[in-house]
C-alpha cells in the first residue's frame, strides 16, 4: 500500500479511537491486518429506530489510492434496510461513491453509516424488495427490521410469530437464514414463502 495512504489511515484510525463523539455514538474500529488495508468497524443501531439495541459489524477495505478514492465498506452483520443489500451487505451511500472527497475521513464514513440507519433513502435503494416494503408496508418493514436486528445484531426484541414461521420452514428442511429471507420478502406470508421455495 502506498505510504501516503498508510500514514493517512493510521492518523485517522487514531482520531477515531480518541474521538469522544465516536465513543458516545457507540462506534468502534479495529485493525484486521498489519498492512492497514482492512479494518473492522462496529456501529450501534441508533435510538428510536428498528436497529436500536443492535451492534452492526462493517468490513472496511482501504484502497491504495486512499484518500483520493473512498474505502470499500459493507455490512458483515445482516440487516433489513432499503439502502443496504440484505444478501451481500453492499451499501448505497453517496459518500462511498461519487460524492467522496479526499478531505473525508473514516470518522465521516462511520458517522454517516450510523446516520443512514436512522434516515433511510427508499427512493435510492440498494435492496428494491426492502425499499418497496418500506414505502408500501411500513409496519411490516419495522417488524422485519426489528426481527433481523434481534436475529443478527443481538437486538432486544422477540417475535414469536416470526420465529414460529421460520421454524415451520426449517421443519421442511430450509436453512434458517433462507427461511428468514424468504418470509421477509413475502411479508411474513407463510403460504407464499412456501410456494416460492417449493414451486
Swiss-Prot record:
The keyword Transit peptide does not apply. Residues 161-199 form the UBA domain. SUPFAM superfamilies: UBA-like (SSF46934), UBC-like (SSF54495). It catalyses: S-ubiquitinyl-[E1 ubiquitin-activating enzyme]-L-cysteine + [E2 ubiquitin-conjugating enzyme]-L-cysteine = [E1 ubiquitin-activating enzyme]-L-cysteine + S-ubiquitinyl-[E2 ubiquitin-conjugating enzyme]-L-cysteine. It is an enzyme of class 2 (transferase). One of its GO terms (biological process) is protein polyubiquitination. One of its GO terms (cellular component) is nucleus. Residues 4-154 form the UBC core domain. GO terms for molecular function: ATP binding; proteasome binding; ubiquitin conjugating enzyme activity; ubiquitin protein ligase binding; ubiquitin-protein transferase activity. During gastrulation, expression is highest in the invaginating posterior midgut primordium (PMG), high expression is also observed in the cephalic furrow and ventral ectodermal neurogenic region. In stage 10-11 embryos, expression is high in the pole cells present in the pocket formed by the PMG. During germ band retraction, expression appears to reinitiate in many tissues, especially the gut and nervous system. After dorsal closure, expression is detectable at low levels throughout the embryo. Pathway: Protein modification; protein ubiquitination. CDD domains: UBA_II_E2_UBCD4, UBCc_UBE2K. The active site is at 92 (glycyl thioester intermediate). Its EC number is 2.3.2.23. Keywords: ATP-binding, Nucleotide-binding, Transferase, Ubl conjugation pathway. Catalyzes the covalent attachment of ubiquitin to other proteins. Belongs to the ubiquitin-conjugating enzyme family. Interacts with Rpn10. This is Ubiquitin-conjugating enzyme E2-22 kDa. It comes from Drosophila melanogaster.
Amino acid at each position: 500500500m502506498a505510504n501516503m495512504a498508510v500514514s493517512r489511515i493510521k492518523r485517522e484510525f487514531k482520531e477515531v479511537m480518541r474521538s469522544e463523539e465516536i465513543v458516545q455514538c457507540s462506534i468502534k474500529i479495529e485493525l484486521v491486518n498489519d498492512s492497514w488495508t482492512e479494518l473492522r468497524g462496529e456501529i450501534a443501531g441508533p435510538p428510536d429506530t428498528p436497529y436500536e439495541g443492535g451492534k452492526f459489524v462493517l468490513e472496511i477495505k482501504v484502497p491504495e489510492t486512499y484518500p483520493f478514492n473512498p474505502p470499500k465498506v459493507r455490512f458483515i452483520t445482516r440487516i433489513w434496510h432499503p439502502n443496504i443489500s440484505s444478501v451481500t451487505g453492499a451499501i448505497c451511500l453517496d459518500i462511498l461513491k461519487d460524492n467522496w472527497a479526499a478531505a473525508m475521513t473514516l470518522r465521516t464514513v462511520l458517522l454517516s453509516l450510523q446516520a443512514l440507519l436512522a434516515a433511510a433513502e427508499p427512493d435510492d435503494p440498494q435492496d428494491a424488495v426492502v425499499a418497496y416494503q418500506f414505502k408500501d408496508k411500513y409496519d411490516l418493514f419495522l417488524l422485519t427490521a426489528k426481527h433481523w436486528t434481534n436475529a443478527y445484531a443481538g437486538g432486544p426484541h422477540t417475535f414469536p410469530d416470526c420465529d414460529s414461521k421460520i421454524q415451520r420452514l426449517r421443519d421442511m428442511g430450509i436453512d434458517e437464514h433462507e427461511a428468514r429471507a424468504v418470509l421477509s420478502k413475502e411479508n411474513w406470508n407463510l403460504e407464499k414463502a412456501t410456494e416460492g421455495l417449493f414451486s
